[in-house]
Amino acid sequence: MFGWHWLLEWQTPYEFHGHLIEKVLAEEKTPYQHVTLVEFTRFGKGLIIDGKVQSTLYDEHIYHELLVHPLLLSLTKPPKSVLILGGGEGATLREVLKYKSVEKAVMVDIDEKVIEFAKKYLYEWHQGAFEDKRTNLVITDGLKFIKETKEKYDAIILDLTDPIKNSTSYMLYTKEFYEKLREILNERGGIVTQATSPSFSLEVYVTIYNTIKEVFKEASASYTYMASFDGLWGFVYGGVRPDLLSEDEVDSKINERIDGQLRFYDGYSHKISFSLPKNIKSEFQKITKISTEKDPIYVPA
């Protein structure tokens, strides 16, 4: 943070995105991370964790709809039980609860302060999802929860902070962690994770894909442009193949499975998001790294 007026968000060791801040709504250094809620001049309200923009009012719906819906629509049967790791703003939960079939949505977040801030300041994100009777909010470490849970889920959504060295999240992008997730998935279930930026950390994006494909055998990758992130943003899905859904299938399943409005995602945007450009697709042939506990992947900044 530069004074109280600018956030200088480093994208790589060589470049940053400067965000003008109108005012700081709340700020606290918790035992896990530095959490700040602000009003950006361009993007409106926004959540910052450890100097990284997590989401803004301007375009959070793009990120959260592309994170959630390709996974849940590509499941053979409409999902009944969904596990969310991270997603403290409540927007991922909001999208999950739009499914008529969902009976239980378990959301696990390590930092109670993020939830507290979200409930107070980010209603536009959660829209009351924390109070939905289908919601089970658990404040604990995600890895600890996965090791101890006895339940199985139709879908698991990883809305985590980036794999930054010495952070709370980087071990949640490894082969060993994905193997633990596979054990608590119901048959024909699937997972999705945010997969960082093809613009600034293409090797990380591809490595996450490689790692998920190694564990789940089936995998696909999507991307979209996020203005508040200053570039492309990626998502990787495992155990399912949303990339094989046609435009018409997506639109039909939205009508069948979802109760509520979507602002970004439909059959057309689905097709575009899974149509990776040639320069990115070529890297999937070149990069073979798998992220493991002994050799994890990190974003460059």
Curated annotation (Swiss-Prot):
Its EC number is 2.5.1.23, 2.5.1.126, 2.5.1.16, 2.5.1.79. GO terms for cellular component: cytoplasm. Keywords: Cytoplasm, Polyamine biosynthesis, Spermidine biosynthesis, Transferase. The keyword Cytoplasm applies. It comes from the Archaea. Transmembrane segments: none annotated. It is an enzyme of class 2 (transferase). Pfam families: Spermine_synt_N (PF17284), Spermine_synth (PF01564). Involved in the biosynthesis of polyamines which are thought to support the growth of thermophilic microorganisms under high-temperature conditions. It seems that long-chain and branched-chain of polyamines effectively stabilize DNA and RNA, respectively. Catalyzes the irreversible transfer of a propylamine group from the amino donor S-adenosylmethioninamine (decarboxy-AdoMet) to various amine acceptors such as putrescine (1,4-diaminobutane), 1,3-diaminopropane, sym-norspermidine and spermidine. This is Polyamine aminopropyltransferase.
